Regions:
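Hydrophobic/aromatic beta-strand elements that line small-molecule binding cavities or substrate pockets
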Residues: 51, 64-70, 83, 95-101, ...
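A short hydrophobic beta-strand element
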Residues: 72-82
Length: 131
């Protein structure tokens, strides 16, 4: 079971932009990640490689400070907001909820939930998402 401080350390690392390092530091070797009801990706090395591959396609990934997260025993829920800037400078936003199952002080399973119809909406100059 993770302590609240351990979860906060994970959140801090992601918000600071250290996405791949966060996987290295906070996930079990046999961890899984799953997008909605898609096929889970398995294994820390694969998760790190996939994350790096996604980041390499972007100019920038900005993680908004987390306003809401819950810790209940081995279960953690996080409301994430991400802005990605592509190579052409277009900014898009994703809001999602991540449900994690921790084993000890590391993440064993993570599943992301978001609306695929509105995911990655373009962020206008005024900061609002255009759908």
């Amino acid at each position: 079971m993770p302590s609240r401080e351990r979860v906060e350390a994970f959140l801090k690392e992601v918000v600071e932009g250290s996405h791949v390092t966060a996987i290295a530091d906070f996930y079990h070797d046999d961890a899984t990640m799953q997008e909605n009801l898609g096929v889970p990706r398995r294994g820390k090395e694969m998760l790190m490689a996939r994350e790096q591959s996604v980041l390499d396609q972007l100019q920038k990934m900005h993680t908004h400070p987390v306003q809401t997260f819950l810790v209940d025993g081995d279960n953690v829920a996080i409301r994430w907001t991400f802005d990605k800037t592509d190579k052409d400078g277009v900014v898009q936003r994703l809001e999602e909820v991540a449900l994690q199952q921790w084993r000890g002080d590391r993440i064993a399973k993570e599943q992301f939930f978001y609306d695929t119809a509105t995911a990655w909406g373009v962020v206008g100059p005024d900061g609002t998402v255009q759908r």
